[in-house]
Amino acid sequence: MKQDLYKESSPPPSTTKSKGLYVIVAALVTTAIYLLYSQGYSNTHGEKDMPSVVPNLVLPANPSSDHSFAVKHIYHHNTEADANHGRMDVSGEWVRAAQKAQHLNLGQDTHRYMASNARDPYTNLPLKSRTQKVKRWRQRDPDHVESYLEAARLNPQLYGAMDFDWVEEDILVPDVTDRDTVVSLAVMASNAYVDVPFTGDWTNVSWKETGGIGWQSDGVRGHIFVDQTPGSPLVVIALKGTSAAIFDSGGDTVINDKTNDNLLFSCCCARVSYLWNTVCDCYTGESYTCDQECLEKELYAEDRYYRAVLDIYRNVTHLYPQKQIWVTGHSLGGALSAMLGRTYGIPAVGYEAPGELLPTKRLHLPSPPGIPWSQEHIWHFGHTADPIFMGVCNGASSSCSIGGYAMETSCHSGLQCMYDVVTDKGWHLSMVNHRIHTVIDEVLLAYNETAACVPPPPCQDCFNWNFVMGNDKDDDDKDKKKKKKTSTSSSVVSKTKTSTSSTVATNTMPSLPDPTCVERNWYGKCIRYDPEIKQQYGDSHTVTHVTMA
């Protein structure tokens, strides 16, 4: 049963009264949960309550457009069952070690850029801002937003019927037409990849009163940059992207990064073919059919990166309640930045991010209807020689597939700012061009002007897949079982009597019900059917004796 899951639809005329009553009861229960959470009665996943804070977004009378940022904290949220939050307050010792690592990793062009401007990527990053009108929720405290996300997940049919309180506000956004600003945000995104030392600089900020206070590195990491300009209200969160062993030396987060990549950017749990190991059990067994309810549950699970990013944002708003927050990141970090920006209506700048429109819709993230593109607060920077950003890193022979990454999305939300390096420089599609240092040194710094940010072209991901809800799948299974029983009974009552008194033994094939395929190969051929049919009819023809009287 194929349906558009992202559009409000009316129930079919054949809906029974009991099913209608169930929908009404479910709606009332979901609304009650949503209201209770929004009133502040939520206990964050069994942990000690962290105050839900809405950053003070009142602009100063004459805000300065020039800012200078320095890293002050590094947050980490692991994705194990016993989730711990780690925060390192940056010390002078750490800055000196990070500077050395940064100079070893960044290209010479970046060295010259920083030296010529008397700036260091860890102590002084220049940014320019501008005031822009943005339409977003009036009530954006984490408790309220997360209660909505939970309600939308429990009853997605109500998503289109919810009435949101939208408000237009003037906020500070990054000036994406300024070259220094775009480069500085990219350097922040690259800093999130730098390995952090296991020293006494770390401070445990676990929300739990008791329990382990360890450091686990296989999760989400975010660097927090604070504006050093007096009176400035800005903080930037830089989220780490994918660490992939096939692209670099890898790291502690490789396994979790890969799992979240395959969950966020594949059509159905990385079910590319029967040869692939899926990251969740949402594939129904029918060709190109996936359980949408299962997917939404997996995306919002506690051990997934989107949930971890929400918790990092909650921590930062608690630490800086009077600051406005921007977010940036590269690759996976860029996609998570855009999703976080969409969730809370904050400015987000991503670099070479995979298409994140599909998970944005699956999570029912709030998006104001009918806003002009001039009010868009999410920007995606990329170039035409990056197969991940362009959405073409798929197929059996692609680098992503060889490495076990199911990168099947290409659609972005927000504005696209694309450098045409294929035409201008003669580049070819290559995974090497996806690296953040290649982007900084050979693209952002090689152009005198930033790329124009324009609305993305019409786009649709996973057009050949059929996404069904759990209830729809159950109804389809019931209909198939009814068909089986009907055809079986009709084939049994097939004996007829005539006036002839002889007995004839004939080999006849009973009319089998339509077989249900439970497993297909990579090109769609069924290789295993429903075991009920085999048990009922066997593998050979049935010999039926018909008596003619």
Curated annotation (Swiss-Prot):
Keyword rRNA processing: no
Segments on the Cytoplasmic face: 1-19
SUPFAM superfamilies per record: alpha/beta-Hydrolases
A GO BP entry: piecemeal microautophagy of the nucleus
Localization of this protein: Endosome, Multivesicular body membrane; Prevacuolar compartment membrane
Function: Lipase which is essential for lysis of subvacuolar cytoplasm to vacuole targeted bodies and intravacuolar autophagic bodies. Involved in the lysis of intravacuolar multivesicular body (MVB) vesicles. The intravacuolar membrane disintegration by ATG15 is critical to life span extension.
A cellular component annotation (GO) from this entry: vacuolar lumen
Biased composition (Low complexity): 487-504
Positions on the Lumenal side per record topology: 43-549
Cited InterPro entries: AB_hydrolase_fold, ATG15_Lipase, Fungal_lipase-type
Location of the active site: 331 (charge relay system)
Reaction catalysed by this enzyme: a triacylglycerol + H2O = a diacylglycerol + a fatty acid + H(+)
UniProt KW keywords: Autophagy, Endosome, Glycoprotein, Hydrolase, Lipid degradation, Lipid metabolism, Membrane, Signal-anchor, Transmembrane, Transmembrane helix
EC number: 3.1.1.3
Gene Ontology terms, MF aspect: phospholipase activity; triacylglycerol lipase activity
Name of the molecule in the record: Putative lipase ATG15
Species of provenance: Yarrowia lipolytica (strain CLIB 122 / E 150) (Yeast)
Positions of transmembrane segments: 20-42
Region Disordered: start-end pairs: 474-510
Recorded topology in the membrane: Single-pass type II membrane protein
Pfam families for this protein: Lipase_3
Chain positions carrying an annotated carbohydrate: 204, 315, 448
Subunit field text: Binds to both phosphatidylinositol (PI) and phosphatidylinositol 3,5-bisphosphate (PIP2).
Main subcellular location: membrane
Family assignment from sequence similarity: Belongs to the AB hydrolase superfamily. Lipase family.
